Amino acid sequence: VGMFGDFQVDATDFLHPGRNVVVVKVTRDISGAAAQTSDAMENYYSSVRKDVEDNKNDQRANRKVLTDIPHGFYGDNPAGIWQPVKLVISNPLKVEDVFIKPTLDGASMDITVKNHSARKKNFDIRVDIVDKQTGETLYGAPVLTKLALTANGENMYTCSIDGLKPKLWEPTTPNLYDFRISVTESKGKVADCLTVTSGFRTFKSKDGFLYLNGRKFWMRGGNHIPFAICPNDSILADKFMQLMKAGNVQSTRTHTTPWNELWVSAADRNGIAISFEGTWSWLMIHSTPIPDKNVLDLWSSEWLRVMKKYRNHPSVFFWTVNNEMKFYDLDADMERSKEKFRIVSDVVKGMRELDPTRPVCFDSNYLHSKALRRFGQDFLNTVDDGDIDDNHAYYNWYDFSLFRFFNGEFQKQFKSPGRPLISQEMSTGYPNAETGHPTRSYQLIHQNPYSLIGYEAYDWADPMHFLKVQSFITGELAETLRRTNEQVSGIMHFAYMTWFRQCYNYKNIQPYPTYYAMQRAMQPVLVSAELWGRNLYAGEKLHTRIYVVNDSEDGRDLLPMALNWSIVDEKGKILASGTEQFPAVEYYGRKYIEPAIVMPSVLPSDKMNVKLKLVLVENGQTLSQNEYDLILANKRWNIAKVSENKKIVLLDKDNTSAVLDFLQVKYQKASSVKELVQIKRKADLCIISGLKECTDDEKTLLRTYQQKGGKLLLLNSKEIAKKVYPEHITGWIIPTEGDIVVMERDDAPVFDGIGVLDLRYFNNNKREIPLACHATLKANRNENVTELAGQMKIHAYIDGGKPEDRIQKIESMRGLTLLQIKDGKGTATVSTLCTEKADTDPIAGKLLVND
């Protein structure tokens, strides 16, 4: 029977008046095969991240792990009765099922009636529709009369009601009605009455968008939520969904396992729109063999029963077949991949027959455009691949900086004409449920958090470091996806329940910072700043675009507005402020202006953490508010901080002289390495900047100079560093991003005045990824090398293999951006940091003067 669908047993012949004992035997295997172990779950989970060639010879993908019943993410071989059981006692003439297909002014209904008696029954069908909150009757009348069923007969009857003016169901206004369907026999005697709680709403896929009640609808989503941990906790269900609504999140996905009646009904009450996902994540993934027919039949029949169970719930907006089956991308056998496609397509066709009122997502992570490239249009014409495209992405967590998506790249890469594009899994990392540190497997096995915050990722550090950075990337990504993707229909950010401490306990649950970042990012009307670099000098203009995104919950156009901005310190004191006029914005539209925002000219402290605050006002009413962290510094924090008595010689190949001039650093120019090290009076510091090559003689000159006590500073001269110090520097990596650098030794003098999380998003007043480094150096760690700062590529899982293999993979993705080399009596500091931004970024400037 499976794990999630309803089933019924007619026990009439087995029960008798008085006390009855009902015994149910539950078995945990199918066709005599052993239960699937959690190892199979791990195989599925890891294979999501494999390429086609990696999958084609997967020896673990054997039939044994595919001969179990679908059980979602539950990997502990669950067995037993876990959903409510009820005994129904009725008259022989009984309403067996009702399917309500609502419109905006009524509904059509499929009503199934069965006559369990041994003689013919004549009857009428009456429908009463009652407002669940007020008790007011919206409609009440017979809809079908003079009907008859023969002995043991069953039939489905269809009726339509229109011309009503119901309160519509939307996430903002989750209006519910009790639909009471009665069968009445002679003289109006009610033989049976079935009450179904539902609502009036439509949800459609049309012209490449999603429409709720006739207007475009952007899903402001977060998933998953803690159903699977606490499936029978009604208080938690209501509490969590109310927190979601307060956080401006109005949609989710039933990820990991289908929900039960308790949680779906809570979504109906609280106004949470649902993508209802199927029972078998990773079914037929990559090059796994196709399961036996009886297993597939069990899966498909149970899934259709699940759909039938929940299709009257207004919160269920669309159906998603499964999670990340991905055979369409990853099966190395093209013919087998097509056969898998046809199997799922047949299920989609069955879904449409069972529920023609809702869109279908073929698979959570399926993109029509990718299937088109692989299979061709002729094949796709023979299958049904659903309505909705869904791209899973882990930006700034597994791959890519969020700044790569500031110009609508998401829709440019993934939108197919005529199909709504969403993401049901936009992940940015996971705090644990107790302290807020990164979850253990990512922290220790995969090392993803290290890429973001270095050694602050581990349990000895303050968890607020991870919580702060994780909230930043989550909120910023959510905002940019809304700002620049007018062709997209919504994003569900992942994993929503990890944004709370003790998400499983309704008494103790507390939001983490990401909740509040997303509360701002998910405002229906969103005022949002496009910010690249995050560090500025006092008195400088903030180069930004301020957007307004109009997903107003009443679907209206916005009138011209006022944008109030302010720069405030950590105590809320306003340091600068102003007002700009903002034009009208149509519903589902977005516009931007480039305001004249100037930082305060003088700061009370030389370096300050401040916020840019935005308030959007229409006709005196505040529509949206937002805030962004910035670092500001007085120019005097860096200017003239190097002693005039310090003799500095500069070999300049990349205009570093302009930066030193800005910092009022006195220096003498040299035109060659020879001149650099043979100045008549020995220099306190020799700087080489932007030099790409040198001769063997020049290499010797530099090493000799250092050995005798000379001090060198190599700025963005990686080629020279490798040649001069081959025993210490073996190569370099050009980062895919380079916008985050982490400290190796936060107590080093070079970091005086710089916070442990400050080495990121260096500002140059340009609309480009705000690099903090240009390269990472591969260095041999030894007693003569002092590691100061490093960078690690944003990366996905580090799976399998021996410890040595894992270490090798980690080392292949990381290196040093700042190090010091001792040789003889002298030292050399080698930097790939973006210190050329010192005249626009105070952190870059402080690094340079500290060197």
Positions of the model-derived regions?
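Extended acidic/polar, glycine-enriched regions
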Residues: 14-19, 112-206, 604-636
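Extracellular ligand-binding/catalytic regions of CAZymes and related secreted enzymes
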Residues: 501, 505-514, 538, 563, ...
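Accessory beta-strand-rich segments of carbohydrate-active enzymes
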Residues: 1-94, 117, 136, 258-261, ...
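Beta-strand-rich binding/interaction modules
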Residues: 107-147, 541-583, 591-596, 607-617
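Substrate-binding/catalytic cleft of secreted carbohydrate-active enzymes
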Residues: 238-239, 251-509
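Aromatic-Pro/Gly-enriched surface loop or interdomain linker
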Residues: 607-609, 621-689, 716-719, 727-741, ...
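N-terminal carbohydrate-binding accessory modules
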Residues: 180-245, 265, 630, 639
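A glycine-rich, often tryptophan-bearing local segment used as a flexible ligand/cofactor-contacting loop or short
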Residues: 692-773
